[in-house]
Amino acid sequence: MEEVLEAAEKIRSMEVRGAARIARFAAETLMKFAEKASDEKFDEEMRFAAETLLNTRPTAVSLYNAINYVMRYSGESVEEKRQSVIRRAREFINWVETAQRKIGEIGEKRIKDGYTVMTHCNSSAALSVIKKAHENGKRVEVIATESRPRWQGHLTVKQLREAGIEVTLIVDSAVRYFINEVDCVVVGADTITANGALINKIGTSQIALAAKEARVPFMVAAETYKFSPKTLFGELVVIEERDAREVAPEEILKLGVKVRNPAFDVTPRDYIDVIITEIGAIPPEMAYIVITERLGYAGIEEEEITLNSRHFD
């Protein structure tokens, strides 16, 4: 169990970050744990491992979907169950890998030669769209936000430069100043709700608002495992608030200053032009169909929907 606790801490501390990376890491962790879990308490130990991982990042539905997918294992004997976990984990990991590639192929069609693209945070799905356009010979420049307070934008600019793409780094508060120099915005997603709203890195909704005002297309790159089945049943997405020390140094905190540090915000579907998924470019209104048909949650057993629900109240 020690390796599960270590993996959970890596997710909680954001040593492993990004919705896709978190989902894949969780699937890999469950697969490795299944190989070592005892025969006597296999189901009990697997469930404890799943709940431990689920309790780390409440907003990232990719984590929930990854764990729910792997935990739908089957088998009569313990060995059959063990092999089922391993097989399902590998299937999910393959889903992560192929989805990102397909999103790049579909999304790059909306990036024209000579475009300047704005992006926020560090989304592997969003960057796959930009990188694919560049690989296909299109001249693309990127304006990337710093994405405070965790500075994910620094990762983005490094990855773009490594790919040979011209990039300008700006502070988050300068988005509206630069929005008229942009041809489109491409961001990733932590969660897509049943009504088509986007939950993503704090600051995303302000970019969407600025883009709407400037009539700049706002596109979301999101794998279908980032769509939230829980919102189909009326549950609201919990917005994680992180440590005040990410925002302010101790000399400020010791003055008794109250600090709020939400990690995510909500962008209404009215501000989203299109969601680029591995199954196609869809309007946000189609999120309900993705959840019920692609994820198969229309009539699924209640146990699978409410796994570890006490952590999401």
UniProtKB/Swiss-Prot annotation:
It comes from the Archaea. Signal peptide: none annotated. Reaction proceeds via a cis-phosphoenolate intermediate. It comes from Archaeoglobus fulgidus (strain ATCC 49558 / DSM 4304 / JCM 9628 / NBRC 100126 / VC-16). One of its GO terms (biological process) is L-methionine salvage from methylthioadenosine. This is Ribose 1,5-bisphosphate isomerase. SUPFAM superfamilies: NagB/RpiA/CoA transferase-like. It catalyses: alpha-D-ribose 1,5-bisphosphate = D-ribulose 1,5-bisphosphate. The keyword Nucleotide-binding does not apply.
